[in-house]
Design a protein with these regions (language model features):
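Catalytic beta-strand/loop cores that center a nucleophilic Ser/Cys/Thr
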Residues: 310-352, 388
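Active-site-proximal beta-strand elements of phosphoester/diester hydrolases
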Residues: 198-202, 315-316, 355-359
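RNA-binding accessory domains that recognize and position tRNA/RNA substrates
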Residues: 1-236, 248, 364-366, 376-388
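Short, flexible hinge/linker loops that cap or flank conserved catalytic cores
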Residues: 191-195, 266, 348
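Cysteine-nucleophile active-site neighborhood
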Residues: 240-325, 366-384
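Residue-level structural signal for beta-strand termini and adjacent loop
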Residues: 25-27, 64, 318, 349, ...
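Proline-centered loop/turn at the N-terminus of a beta-strand
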Residues: 114, 198, 271-273, 289, ...
Length: 388
C-alpha cells in the first residue's frame, strides 16, 4: 500500500535525471542499478522476474496488484530471479491461491532481489515512455536512510545495455537434455516419451516453457551453451536448430553467435527457428541489423499482424532491441509486424525452412495465439525428413 503520511520510507528509486521515488521496501536489502522498464502484464509476475531476458533491468509492473497469488516452484522460468529489481504500486499482502508455496517478498529476499512498493507507477511509466528506458538505482534500507546524491550517481554510472553481451551470464554451463512438456490439468508437467525429431537448442537465456513447448511438439531437445560452435551443433546430427530468447545487445552476442549460425546455414539444410534474441541472432546472420528501442516492448497484450495471412495475434513480448526491417536482404521476408509501432516481429527465408519471431509464442505469461509456431517448426522437420 502507499506510505501513510508521516510513515518513514524504507526504499528509494533514483533515476539518472535526478527524479526520486520513495516507497516501502520488500525483498532483499541493499542497492542495485540497472535499466528501468515497464511491463503491462496483469499476471505472471514470477515468470517475468525469472525470465533471463530481463537481466540488467528493473521491472516496473503497471498492474497495481502484484503478489496476490504468492509464488511456487512450478512457475519459475529459470532457477532464480534474473531481473535486477521490482517496482510495484502496492506492496504485496498475504497471498491467497491453492498453488502458493510462499510470499513474494520472502521469495525475493531469499534470492537477493530488491523491490519497492507504494509509489505512483503510472507517473513512473509515463516517465519511462517519455524519456526512453532510463538508468536507475534502487535501494532498500529498513532504517530509511538514503544518500540520494550517491544513488543518482550510481544510476548515471550504469553503462546501459548497448554493447553488453548478457547471454554469456545467463546461459547454461554445459549441455543437457530436456524432456518436460507443457503443464496440463490434472497431471501438471509430464515427460515426453515419443519424440519425432532431434533438436539442438542454443541457450542464450532460454525460458523453461519454451523448452516445454518444443518437447510438446515432439522434439527430443538437447540444450547447448550460447558459446556453442557449428561443429558442436552438427556433432549431435540434429533435425533442427532452435535459437532461444535472451538478454542484452544482440550485436554483442552476435560476435560469436552469428558465425555459428552462418556456418550451420552453409553446411546443413536443417530447419531453424528463433525466438526473441534468437530472432535477432538469425536476422544478423542473414545480413540485417538491429537497433535499440526507445522503451522496448514488455507485456502480454501486444498485437502482432501475420503479413502472410492477415491474422492478428495477441502476444507476449519482452525486448529492448529490434530488427531493422529496412536492412533485411533479398531472399528474407518480413512475416510479422507490431501493430503498436510497426516494428519487425518476424522473418523467414524465401527458399528454406528458416524463420523466427520477436514475440514469445510460449507465453508464460500471456496468450497462446502463437503456439502454432512450434508445430510449424516440427512440420518443417517432417518435410525435410520425408524428402531425404
Amino acid at each position: 500500500m502507499p506510505l501513510i503520511q508521516g510513515q518513514k520510507p524504507t526504499a528509494c528509486l533514483a533515476l539518472a535525471d535526478g527524479t526520486i521515488f520513495y516507497g516501502k521496501g520488500f525483498g532483499a536489502t541493499g542497492v542495485t542499478e540497472a535499466e528501468l522498464c515497464f511491463n503491462t502484464a496483469m499476471t505472471g509476475y514470477q515468470e517475468i522476474m525469472t525470465d533471463p531476458s530481463y537481466a540488467g533491468q528493473i521491472v516496473t509492473f503497471t498492474f497495481p496488484h502484484i503478489g496476490n497469488v504468492g509464488v511456487n516452484p512450478e512457475d519459475d522460468e529459470t532457477a532464480n530471479p534474473v531481473a535486477a529489481g521490482m517496482v510495484v504500486k502496492w506492496d504485496p499482502t498475504e497471498p491467497s491461491n491453492y498453488r502458493s508455496a510462499g510470499e513474494l517478498g520472502d521469495w525475493l529476499a531469499s534470492r537477493g532481489r530488491i523491490a519497492i512498493g507504494g509509489i505512483d507507477t503510472r507517473r513512473l511509466t509515463r516517465a519511462i515512455r517519455a524519456r526512453g528506458a532510463p538508468h536507475a538505482a534502487l535501494a532498500h534500507n529498513p532504517d530509511g536512510q538514503f544518500d540520494v546524491e550517491a544513488l543518482v550517481a550510481r544510476a548515471r554510472s550504469f553503462s546501459g545495455l548497448v554493447g553488453l553481451d548478457l547471454a554469456k551470464d545467463v546461459t547454461c554451463a554445459q549441455s543437457y537434455r530436456w524432456d518436460e512438456m507443457r503443464w496440463a490439468w490434472p497431471d501438471g508437467f509430464t515427460r515426453q516419451t515419443e519424440a519425432r525429431h532431434k533438436v539442438v537448442a542454443i541457450d542464450y537465456g532460454a525460458k523453461r516453457n519454451i523448452l516445454r513447448c518444443l518437447a510438446s511438439a515432439g522434439c527430443d531437445v538437447t540444450v547447448l551453451p550460447a558459446s556453442a560452435t557449428a561443429e558442436d551443433v552438427l556433432a549431435h546430427n540434429p533435425d533442427g536448430l532452435f535459437l532461444s530468447n535472451g538478454p542484452g545487445d544482440p550485436a554483442a552476442t552476435g560476435k560469436y553467435a552469428v558465425p555459428m549460425i552462418q556456418k550451420v546455414l552453409e553446411r546443413s539444410d536443417m530447419p531453424i527457428f528463433g525466438i526473441c534474441l534468437g530472432h535477432q541472432m538469425l536476422a544478423l546472420a542473414l545480413g540485417a541489423q538491429t537497433v535499440k528501442m526507445n522503451h522496448g516492448h514488455h507485456g502480454a497484450n501486444h498485437p502482432v499482424k501475420d503479413l502472410d495471412t492477415g491474422k492478428v495475434e495477441i502476444t507476449s513480448m519482452n525486448h529492448g532491441f529490434a530488427v531493422d526491417s529496412q536492412t533485411l536482404p533479398a531472399g528474407v521476408k518480413e512475416t510479422h509486424v507490431s501493430l503498436f509501432d510497426g516494428s519487425n516481429c518476424g522473418i523467414r527465408m524465401a527458399d528454406r525452412p528458416v524463420f523466427s519471431v520477436q514475440h514469445h509464442p510460449e507465453a508464460s505469461p500471456g496468450p497462446q495465439d502463437s503456439f502454432y509456431l512450434f508445430e510449424r517448426f516440427a512440420t518443417s522437420m517432417d518435410k525435410v525428413s520425408s524428402a531425404v
